[in-house]
Amino acid sequence: MENFFIVKKLASATYGKALNVDLNKLLQALNHHSLQGLISYCSALTILHYDYSTLAARLSVYLLHQSTASSFSKAVSLQAAQSCSRLSSHFVDVVYKYKAIFDSYIDYSRDYKLSLLGIETMKNSYLLKNKDGVIMERPQDAYMRVAIMIHGMGRVVNMKMILLTYDLLSRHVITHASPTMFNAGTKKPQLSSCFLLNVNDNLENLYDMVKTAGIISGGGGGIGLCLSGIRAKNSFISGSGLRSNGIQNYIVLQNASQCYANQGGLRPGAYAVYLELWHQDIFTFLQMPRLKGQMAEQRLNAPNLKYGLWVPDLFMEILEDQIHNRGDGTWYLFSPDQAPNLHKVFDLERSQHENAHREFKKLYYQYVAEKRYTGVTTAKEIIKEWFKTVVQVGNPYIGFKDAINRKSNLSHVGTITNSNLCIEITIPCWEGNEAEQGVCNLAAVNLAAFIRESSYDYRGLIEAAGNVTENLDNIIDNGYYPTEATRRSNMRHRPIGIGVFGLADVFASLKMKFGSPEAIAIDEAIHAALYYGAMRRSIELAKEKGSHPSFPGSAASKGLLQPDLWVRCGDLIPSWENRVAQTTQGVLTPKKWWQLRLAAIQGVRNGYLTALMPTATSSNSTGKNECFEPFTSNLYTRRTLSGEFIILNKYLMDDLEEINLWSEDIQQQLLNAGGSIQHILDIPAEIRERYKTSREMNQKILTKHAAARNPFVSQSMSLNYYFYEPELSQVLTVLVLGWKKGLTTGSYYCHFSPGAGTQKKIIRNSEKACNADCEACLL
């Protein structure tokens, strides 16, 4: 009861409803323990009004401010004086030299804009601590630290860009990736998020990749490994006269490495392993995530890894024919030592014409004719085995190998054999002479920051995309590389990955529903603007600093933009420019796209520009919904490394308050329904339709939205699906639809659970299965 009266006073003072309350005096009368209790108490009241969560966040910020330095330079000075300081001397020197500018520009009041989940995430993961675990900086200090790392650590201190980047970060217009946030300004600034490794079939390289992955993970990077080149189990090893163990024991070894090499001590290590479907060990691979009992006791499972399938068009064609009884689904299995290079070729075209450029199909059937196969199965049997596992653990992911390669600006560099931890990064990588290990630096733009009453500010989005492009390009030069092969790859291709978050917030603010023609058009236009802004700035940077070394021969060097590759493949109609011009109200016209093509021929700074990653941490910090996803629920608890937090859909609450419907009765019905409003008939049908959760909407809607935005994505996207029941037919429907529409990602996670209306839990847990595992490429 005491908490209730204190909270009532605090709420009145905070929101200006009781001017006779001295907020500072009231807070100073409370000790640390009492304030922590109030934070928990306020958080529990979120179901009544999201302002309680806001109040809890402000109390948490107040508590942090009481124990940290009151100026940026002082915070840096205190950290530098620590015996085990992580800060680099160069960074400290820059801060001391320009401390008057930094101290006067930083705005600590912006810390109070963070959500409760945001401030707790910052405290747990991003803010620098001393050796005893005591937090030494505030969120604004972290934003300034990142800005200085990006624009102040080179030969020239670009003060204008430092302050602009700080401003964009602190106002939550943009966010940078987790490794950038917690490693910026330190002695070993590994700022990159995603790493791609290709494992060769020799003992030395097999163990080298264990070491490399562990080193990368220790610096905060997430890892994707291609295993398609490893010979199958029982294959003969001529050098020793023995038989191969295949991929299973190696996967177990990488699983152990991941568990040991956590990400900078801040969160668990995170690896994903990829395999092509023709590999003899494919069934073993598909079973490993779910092995239990005796197999688990013998340590033949690897439950901590993520798994991904690299799926060629040929398999999808055979699968579709088998589904529709047009063929028997025969699928041949090979060991790469007997049938080499299948993972190194792809089909440039999807045409069935005999003269079509289909190198994978040609080589596959050549090996069949030569009887090099070691097993025979059917496409259905493989997909059924995949489904058994995906129902239990949500993955293996599905990446469409040929679509990824034929739509890559870097297809001339080499075949893309795998993706990263969250299947949105697609960089060629290989071992051997002049080895390259793929690297990508990530950031994301807050789409909700550009809502202007009932319209959208595409010009602002274009400008922000340009600023992020320059930031990420600098990170390539200023970051630490764990291996020479990672440095070589990043310097040669200079790939960046700009993502988004808050798309659902945009639709809610504009009172649109997912799947409507208007929403799909805006989705397309937003990602067109994002790509345009990034490409425009990359071209400008090329004029200033030079193109990336692998630019000659790239699609851009021939005047082909990312959507042009989709048009060439027949997956996008040529009139897309007119459609985007109409949606953006003339901001992006066909003429501007042609000017961009002509300029690109002269040079582009970055081989890749956009990639749509999960953004749980950014969403947590800013109170916006994750990446391009619909709302998972209108009320749920979010479990993170920072604890559990109640999340209430503020847009729904505002809409219901607007029509005087937000009441205790509605709150209770929302609780009873597990966050769904579909059966609360007092709520108008139009609002119920707009606030369908990700599971309640037809999953084809998610595929159609993905198809609208994918042509403007340089790499790929972390595309989730949500189903009530584990029915293979439903999953196949969206996978085949996505493949036919030319998507690069078939699926990231597939979530299955009973519908909200059938659950009687008070609050349903958020289904972010990847949250604790995949945060390396989360923002």
From Swiss-Prot:
It is an enzyme of class 1 (oxidoreductase). Its EC number is 1.17.4.1. Pfam families: Ribonuc_red_lgC, Ribonuc_red_lgN. Signal peptide: none annotated. Induction: Expressed in the early phase of the viral replicative cycle. Keywords: Allosteric enzyme, ATP-binding, Deoxyribonucleotide synthesis, Disulfide bond, Early protein, Nucleotide-binding, Oxidoreductase. The active site is at N420, C422, E424. One of its GO terms (biological process) is deoxyribonucleotide biosynthetic process. Substrate binds at S178, S193, C194, G222, N420, L421, C422, I423, E424, P614, T615, A616, T617, S618. InterPro entries: NrdE_NrdA_C (IPR013346), RNR_lg_C (IPR000788), RNR_lsu_N (IPR013509), RNR_R1-su_N (IPR008926), Rrm1 (IPR039718). PANTHER family: RIBONUCLEOSIDE-DIPHOSPHATE REDUCTASE LARGE CHAIN, RIBONUCLEOSIDE-DIPHOSPHATE REDUCTASE LARGE SUBUNIT. Ribonucleoside-diphosphate reductase holoenzyme provides the precursors necessary for viral DNA synthesis. Allows virus growth in non-dividing cells. Catalyzes the biosynthesis of deoxyribonucleotides from the corresponding ribonucleotides. Belongs to the ribonucleoside diphosphate reductase large chain family. This is Ribonucleoside-diphosphate reductase large subunit.
